[in-house]
């Protein structure tokens, strides 16, 4: 995965007026916090921030923050968007050590839809969790969890215990929760009802 580097500058002042002035200057205001240090108001050039954001690798990934010659590992915790233009208007970054154990949401994706027995029979994939919260070192955050649907039949339940996680990564919750299931569609159920009648 390519490393994302955000070049930031420190903002003077805080509050709504300061944030608006920052946006008028073509930058996105943000706050850097965590790591046992005081919060710092920062800003990133809007085009640079959008480029990093829309790669899909900013949220939930380790990012290098650069201020002059100084570098800091951070995780983007939140990005706020304008309700009409959908442009980023504010972001929060959290300082982390590369090997620090953190909890983070990771997206779930599914593969081999075409080889799933249940889906071939007309079943549907019901996704319960589109993201899963994982506990892992900051430098080992998986980009995604990929779940193989091959061999899953109607009625099968896919739990977190069935997912092979990378070394050093575990679910943040200590229970075997459901991620998805393959269920019979209403059409498949009515076909089954017609054949039994």
Curated annotation (Swiss-Prot):
One of its GO terms (cellular component) is cytosolic large ribosomal subunit. Transmembrane segments: none annotated. One of its GO terms (biological process) is translation. Keywords: Ribonucleoprotein, Ribosomal protein, RNA-binding, rRNA-binding. Gene3D superfamilies: Ribosomal protein L25, beta domain, Ribosomal Protein L25, Chain P. InterPro entries: Rbsml_bL25/Gln-tRNA_synth_N, Ribosomal_bL25/Gln-tRNA_synth, Ribosomal_bL25_b-dom, Ribosomal_bL25_C, Ribosomal_bL25_long, Ribosomal_L25_dom, Ribosomal_uL5_bac-type. The keyword Acetylation does not apply. The keyword Chloroplast does not apply. One of its GO terms (molecular function) is structural constituent of ribosome. This is one of the proteins that binds to the 5S RNA in the ribosome where it forms part of the central protuberance. Part of the 50S ribosomal subunit; part of the 5S rRNA/L5/L18/L25 subcomplex. Contacts the 5S rRNA. Binds to the 5S rRNA independently of L5 and L18. Belongs to the bacterial ribosomal protein bL25 family. CTC subfamily. This is Large ribosomal subunit protein bL25. It comes from Caulobacter vibrioides (strain NA1000 / CB15N) (Caulobacter crescentus). The gene is rplY.
């Amino acid at each position: 995965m390519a490393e994302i580097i955000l070049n930031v500058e420190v903002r003077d002042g805080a509050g709504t007026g300061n944030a608006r002035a920052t946006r008028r200057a073509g930058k996105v205001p943000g706050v850097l916090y965590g790591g046992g240090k005081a919060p710092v108001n920062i800003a990133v050039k809007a085009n640079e921030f959008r480029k990093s954001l829309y790669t899909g690798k900013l949220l939930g990934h380790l990012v290098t923050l650069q201020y002059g010659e100084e570098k800091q590992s951070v995780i983007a915790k939140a990005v706020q968007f304008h309700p009409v233009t959908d442009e980023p208007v504010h972001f929060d970054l959290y300082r982390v050590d590369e090997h620090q154990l953190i909890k983070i949401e990771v997206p779930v994706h599914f593969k081999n839809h075409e080889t799933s027995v249940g889906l071939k029979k007309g079943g549907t994939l019901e996704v319960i969790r589109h993201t899963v919260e994982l506990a892992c070192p900051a430098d080992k955050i998986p980009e995604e969890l990929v779940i193989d649907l091959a061999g899953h039949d109607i009625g099968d339940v896919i739990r977190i215990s069935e997912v092979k996680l990378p070394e050093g990564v575990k679910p943040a919750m200590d229970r075997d929760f459901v991620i998805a299931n393959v269920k019979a569609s209403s059409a498949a159920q009515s076909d089954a009802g017609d054949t039994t009648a």
